[in-house]
Amino acid sequence: MVVLTICGGGNAAHTLAGIASNQPNMEVRVLTLYADEAERWIKSMETNDFTTIKYATGKDPVHLKTKPKLVTKNPEQGATGADIIVITVPAFAHAQYLTALKPHVKPGTVVVGFPGQPGFDFEIMKIWGDLAKQCTVMNFVSLPWACRIKEFGKSVEVLATKDMMFGSVRNGTVAPKMDPTAMIQGCLGPLPRLECSGHLLGMSIMAVNGMLHPSIMYNRWHDWDGKPVDAPPLFYHGLSQAGADLLSDVSNETIAIAKKVMEQRQGVDLSNVIHMHPYYIGAYPDDISDKSSLYTCINTNAGFKGLTHPCTKTADGKFVPDFTGRYFGEDIPFGLAVTRGIAEIAGCPTPNIDKIIEWAQKLMGKEYLVGGKFTGKDISATRAPQRYGFNTLDSIL
């Protein structure tokens, strides 16, 4: 029997709770600290089944009717005796959960970020201290599914499941109950297939969302004349060749960071930092109709169809870009800024990453880069290694 604790109460937590509860030899608990989510979920399950509806192209939907054993707001109830803890909340909430979990986590526990986002392991090391070294940490670059809650605490829809998902593992000094990759694969079932390789630092260098979303925002809006547009532009399927080239350049800079680290520390494997083009082909093998380039991969990915730039409506019915959402608020401080902080330590120039951060920080009213150096006053609100006092390669490896 594997005891799984899921942290969070959103789309991903609902989905994992339903899917994992359907797997054999699995005790599933949900710990949600947000507002009254636990109470609402418990109340719903008193009178309703919990249904996970899985969709797949060309097949009838599959309805899984299962319930987690426990839903709670109490960290002691949720975490005591857990073999594996999966954190599904956004990066800004990780510290709250890690702090609440710490007194109740046993050495040998597997801690998983779904996705952990860049700096996940830095946050764990800072908050858990020696306990972090005794636990196995896993970080994945994305969520396994496209999913949405249909009715809170009652049903969730899995609109698409990735074929493969990439991640990395750092083994702790105390062995887990079983192989950590096999353990989390057992929670998910056969798909997505989990591929874990390379050093955990690679997951912080290869900030997929941190590269993708700010690059697309920069390409579309950096020279905007301030005039409202008639409709929100398509986000992915409106990507220009120039935008794809910028994203490719940013991706190449992350590969250069990885190579620079490996040059200085023999034996550190950062081959898990790959270009965005092969990443997309691996992540969406059946959704992309033209895989010939990064530009075509994004523009012909069926999963991106119809998605638009975040915009707000003006009084006269037109639209202006909204720079207050997660594409900046999460993907810069918990994404691209982390990558840039690692580059600073490695001594690797990143002109394209710098260009995007310098543009974004003005719109955000933040300061990360000053005169080309990663020394701004708002680094303390990021997950860059410098925020935690990690300023050498040895401290982040």
Curated annotation (Swiss-Prot):
Q: Does the keyword Nucleotide-binding apply?
A: no
* SUPFAM superfamilies per UniProt: 6-phosphogluconate dehydrogenase C-terminal domain-like, NAD(P)-binding Rossmann-fold domains
What does the record give as the reaction this protein catalyses? tauropine + NAD(+) + H2O = taurine + pyruvate + NADH + H(+)
Query: How is the activity of this protein governed by pH, according to its UniProt record?
Result: Optimum pH is 8.5 for the forward reaction, and 6.6-7.3 for the reverse reaction. The half-maximal rate is observed at 6.8 for the forward reaction, and at 5.5-7.9 for the reverse reaction.
How its function is modulated: the record gives: Subject to substrate inhibition by pyruvate for the reverse reaction but not for the forward reaction of the tauropine dehydrogenase activity.
GO terms for MF: tauropine dehydrogenase activity
Tell me the enzyme class. oxidoreductase
Q: Give the E.C. number(s).
A: 1.5.1.23
Q: What's the superkingdom here? A: Eukaryota
What family is this protein classified in?
Belongs to the lysopine/nopaline/octopine/opine/vitopine dehydrogenases family.
Protein name (record)? Tauropine dehydrogenase
